[in-house]
Amino acid sequence: VLKGKSMPSQEIILAITRQESEFDPKANSYAGAKGMMQLMTYTAKLVAKQMDVTYSKRKLTSDPEYNINLGTYYFNSLLNDYAEVYPFAIAAYNAGPKRVRQWRRLNGDPSKNKIDYVNWIELIKFEETRNYVQRVLENMNVYKYMLSQKPVKLEKFFN
């Protein structure tokens, strides 16, 4: 379904999926998010319509590929909305675009040089979202390294 489209890197999707569900296809959150990428049913319905695929609540937790395709498409739309600024898109994936708009207004906007990105992340009002953004960015770099399949040179850690 996603072939031929410019999509986010494998590393960021792995990082989000790890943080959302630890790769559990049957994951259900207390808030109602479902599947590996923890999609809310409203969001999943909207994205399925945008992708021109049939929405299936059951498939959110029974078909990992379906869930990942919807989640990837949604995250890609957030990346496009935020001009490829990962902290904004990641925060929006977790807390919603409305909250990111609020935080950019209240805390300053790093894309307009009003504050740097690290401080912007630290000022995210919700501890869960603040930690989420930090963990996803960390995980993304771990997966980037893992997927490059370059051997770890341990001596650099001991100099």
Residue spans of the language-model regions?
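Catalytic glycan-binding domains that act on GlcNAc-containing polysaccharides
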Residues: 1-159
